[in-house]
Amino acid sequence: MRTKIITEGTTKIEVPVPDENSSFPPSSVSVFYNPEMQLNRDISVAAIASFSKNAPEYTYLDALAASGIRGLRIANEVGLTTSMSDWEEESVRLIEKNITLNSLKNCTAIKRNANVVMLDNSFDIIDLDPFGTPAPFLDTACRSVRKLLCVTATDTAPLCGAHKKAGIRRYGAVPLKTDYYPEMGVRILMGAAARTLARNDKAMTPLLSYASQHYYRVFVEVKKNVISADECLNQMGFVSQCFNCGESRMQNGLAVHIEKECPECGGKTTMAGPLWLGSLHDRDFCDDVLEECEKRKFPRAVKLITLCRDELDIPMHYDYHKLCKSLGLSARPTQELVLTLGERGFEASRTHFSGVSFKTDAPLREIKKIVIQLNS
């Protein structure tokens, strides 16, 4: 295996060099390093630094370490006691070399199955960052974690409805391919975490979640409390979507009655869920993370988290371009629509999900009227 030494953040790491003509993920190397996920890791460093700033004794597990870059950065740049587990012998050897390369005394490399590691040990912070679905590791992670659970899912198609049956199997929820599909995916992932934690009498508070490139990422604070776990489940629910007029409605609860006909146009409605209908972000936490990102000079992370922090705290969003297309109109600047909605007495904001997405508490019929007026 050919390797080279790179620097990410302030951490040096020896990483494998795949063949130039290899596929992605590269089959030519047994240890996987993905440079495209640096934004994910930058945000993780800032978020975990913010979360643990008054608790330097917290322990951190990178459950699916691969090259070890995530755990190495947490140990080196945040200073937490870090464990990194991987089943591959070459991964563990490379992680141990990188621990020495960075002169880290607070790191351990473990050659074991991630689920076994989490069954045998508890950690304050657990990070699941698989290539693919986190579903096979969610049960043991929720059992083992004490304070903060961080989860990445790169299987976006099952989460957002493109591969519906896979979504049902993996996450115990019916996904739906809608105009707001990235948020659908994040909320199904969040809902799966909430239900799995509740089975272990634990509650969660979402601190930060986002969709970026080809993955979804969530950070949730964990609390062992039966009453809080019950209250957490009250924020689960379902979405009723009409594909005829575009109307979507949310209904809280795990056993709900969804009208089969759209109350706006009489068209057939389709149900998605159960999924998380509560907040996706904690604004105070986002402020702390932004401060860390600015201090550490993570400009891409600053831009993304600023959008997350400033999003309207309601479920689901609209795609302005698709809305205009359905009305046979050309789209004007999204910010113009957001400002106009505010002038008409509604709450509205841009979102991080796309450059043309927005959230508002205005009814869809009012949004359509305003869009038509802006184009007249």
Each PLM stretch: what is its role?
Residues 1-376:
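SAM-dependent transferase fold signal centered on methyltransferase-like domains
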